[in-house]
Amino acid sequence: GGWLITHLGDEDGGVYKLNLNGDLIPYLLEVNGQLLPPTNYVHIDNLGRVWVTVSTRLIPRILGCKPNFKDGFIILIDEEKPRIVAENLGFTNECLIHPVTGDLYVNETFSRCLSKFNVSSKGHLLNKTTVMEFGTGEFPDGFAFDIEGGVWVTCVVSNKIIRISSNGQKEIIINDSDVSHVNYVEEAY
């Protein structure tokens, strides 16, 4: 038993296994012969495949926090060797496999969108579509699916929780925004 966790360091990254006894063991430190930069998120789907996101290759990561800069990527670890299955993403954040459709959803924080890919039987990501584009101050971070087919998204900066219904309707569930902070970030963005 144990957990897979990511290392979101200042300069290095990777995925580690944290055993129940507290031992920390490297799980994935490189892909395609390159050391992983700070690594954002890891998800194990119901088929045992491991999906890993890297927000940006830039160090420090803050350099990747731009609206039109897209160097984030997704790694798949399955029975084949670990490999990059999607690139050119706008600050790749949390990703999850939808429990019913099997599609992979991913937040692109600084592109301000939630994207979706179809997943082939070999783990290839196909037919990227935008599920939702977010507005002022809404930088999507984490998310979860609900039993009605909706997606609940947390937004950093604006401190919002947004629900996207299965038919694409956006509903703000919680809005705890600090307008001056949102304006400051929007100016810098």
Model-inferred region functions:
Residues G1-H7, N32-V50, T56-L58, N68-I74, ...:
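Beta-rich, blade/repeat-based domains predominating
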Residues Y16-G22, F69-E79:
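Beta-propeller blade signature
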Residues R112-C113, M132-I172:
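Loop/turn-rich, solvent-exposed surfaces of beta-rich toroidal or solenoidal domains
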Residues L8-G13, I59-D71, T109-R112, V156-V157:
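Short, solvent-exposed loop/turn segments at conserved positions within beta-propeller repeat blades
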Residues G1-Y16, I25-V31:
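Blade-loop segments of beta-propeller domains
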Residues F117-H124:
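Short loop/turn segments immediately following beta-strands, especially the blade-tip
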Residues N19, L63-G64, D78, N118, ...:
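Structural recognition of the beta-propeller blade-terminating site
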Residues L24-N32, K81-E87, N127-E133, K170-I174:
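A short beta-strand motif characteristic of beta-propeller blades
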